[in-house]
């Protein structure tokens, strides 16, 4: 089933010069295509919309601060089972638990600065794509 997913390469990925490597891993998957890509620094309003469900949790403020600390690469990735697939390619949120060969397993350092975000469901993808690519998707 063809799906669309929002993928964000977080400020640590951009700062460490890993965007090319991560994008290359996504592009090498047969049948997946990056249909939109932007480099941008996220404002508070966008971050509040994106992470609103976590407001009030202990990690919310540090997460928003980190995500606003530098540019991110925002992408729309389309393809067969892309939501499940990109999340598998990324690996678990905790880089220590992530297997070698996954993005976080190979390059991740700490939980909050874990390089990549990918939509976790079709519903999340639809909501997130409207936030990051309004009018385009």
UniProtKB/Swiss-Prot annotation:
Catalytic reactions on record: a 2'-deoxyribonucleoside 5'-diphosphate + ATP = a 2'-deoxyribonucleoside 5'-triphosphate + ADP; a ribonucleoside 5'-diphosphate + ATP = a ribonucleoside 5'-triphosphate + ADP
Any GO molecular function: metal ion binding
EC number(s) stated in the UniProt entry for this protein: 2.7.4.6
GO biological process: CTP biosynthetic process; GTP biosynthetic process; purine nucleotide metabolic process; pyrimidine nucleotide metabolic process; UTP biosynthetic process
Compartments it resides in: Cytoplasm
GO cellular component terms, semicolon-separated: cytoplasm
CC cofactor: Mg(2+)
Binding locations of ATP: 10, 59, 87, 93, 104, 114
Active site: 117 (pros-phosphohistidine intermediate)
Sorted UniProt keywords: ATP-binding, Cytoplasm, Kinase, Magnesium, Metal-binding, Nucleotide metabolism, Nucleotide-binding, Phosphoprotein, Transferase
Enzyme class: transferase
PANTHER family tied to this protein: NUCLEOSIDE DIPHOSPHATE KINASE (PTHR11349)
Family: Belongs to the NDK family.
Annotated HAMAP family: NDP_kinase
Role of this protein: Major role in the synthesis of nucleoside triphosphates other than ATP. The ATP gamma phosphate is transferred to the NDP beta phosphate via a ping-pong mechanism, using a phosphorylated active-site intermediate.
Name used for this protein in its record: Nucleoside diphosphate kinase
């Amino acid at each position: 089933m063809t799906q669309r997913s929002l993928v964000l390469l977080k400020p640590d990925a951009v700062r460490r010069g890993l965007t090319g490597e991560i994008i290359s891993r996504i592009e090498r998957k047969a049948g997946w295509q990056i249909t939109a890509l932007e480099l941008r620094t996220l404002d508070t309003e966008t971050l509040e919309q994106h992470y609103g469900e976590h407001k009030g949790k202990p990690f919310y403020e540090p997460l928003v601060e980190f995500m606003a600390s530098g540019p991110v690469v925002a992408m729309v990735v389309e393809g067969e089972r892309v939501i499940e697939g990109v999340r598998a390619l990324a690996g678990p949120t905790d880089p220590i638990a992530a297997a070698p060969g996954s993005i976080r397993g190979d390059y991740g350092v700490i939980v909050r600065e874990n390089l990549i975000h990918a939509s976790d469901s079709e519903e999340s993808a639809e909501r997130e794509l409207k936030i990051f690519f309004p009018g385009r998707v």
